[in-house]
A protein has these predicted regions:
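Short beta-strand scaffold positions
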Residues: 55-56, 120, 141-142
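Active-site-proximal alpha-helix that buttresses catalytic centers in soluble enzyme cores
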Residues: 4-72, 111, 116
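Short active-site segment of divalent metal-dependent hydrolases/proteases
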Residues: 14, 146-147
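Generic beta-sheet signal
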Residues: 6, 136-144
Length: 194
């Protein structure tokens, strides 16, 4: 059974994360806490050997990937636009409150990418990487909502929000689908195939 192993890492913290603002596709950089989280992630992911590091092109994910790559002595081989965060449209930059509530519709926000669209895009990108690096180990740095909805679809159950720079370890098999071994840095007791 040939497994492709993925470390799926959400970028480190940004000022908008700290302020609890929706970021989406808005390109917000890491803050100092986020840079520290990225450097701290090296200790966790260095327990494995990686064949490739890939990230979203948004600066918060790209810088997280660059910091992890430097710590591992590996290059980032690609920035994939398909790994960009879900677009929240006019809700980006807003915090919880009446203005955000006015944009809510079933499944998200008016003028935003739907959860299903984001899951389709993210899972398609991950499965393409699984095909390209079949039997290998790929470290992917992306975004919380994109990873959550893609992983939820892959394993067939709803997952909670993904922590900044935490290890999410998943395995892909072309026939048996996806298995989640670690989520938010902790072991998963039950795995489910897609």
């Amino acid at each position: 059974m040939t497994l492709t192993t993925f470390a799926l890492i959400r970028h480190g913290q940004t000022d908008w994360n700290a302020e609890r603002r929706l970021q989406g596709s808005t390109d917000i950089p890491l803050n100092d806490v986020g840079r520290g989280q990225a450097r701290d992630a090296v200790a966790v992911v260095s327990a494995y050997e990686w064949d490739a590091i890939v990230s979203s092109p948004l600066s918060r994910a790209a810088e997280t990937a660059d910091l992890i790559a430097a710590g591992l002595g590996l290059p980032v081989v690609r920035r994939l636009p398909e790994l960009s965060e879900r677009s929240f449209g006019p809700a980006e930059g807003l915090q919880a409150g009446p203005e955000l509530d006015a944009l809510r519709i079933e499944g998200g926000f008016r003028g935003a990418e739907s959860e299903d669209e984001a899951a389709d895009r993210g899972l398609t990108a991950l499965e393409a990487l699984a095909g390209e690096f079949r039997g290998g180990r790929v470290l992917v740095v992306a975004h919380g909502t994109l990873l959550r909805v893609s992983l939820s679809r892959a394993v067939g159950r709803t997952l909670q929000s993904i922590d900044n720079a935490a290890l999410n370890l998943a395995h892909h098999h072309a026939v048996d689908g996806w298995q989640l071994e670690f989520f938010n840095g902790g072991p998963v007791m039950e795995t489910a195939d897609a």
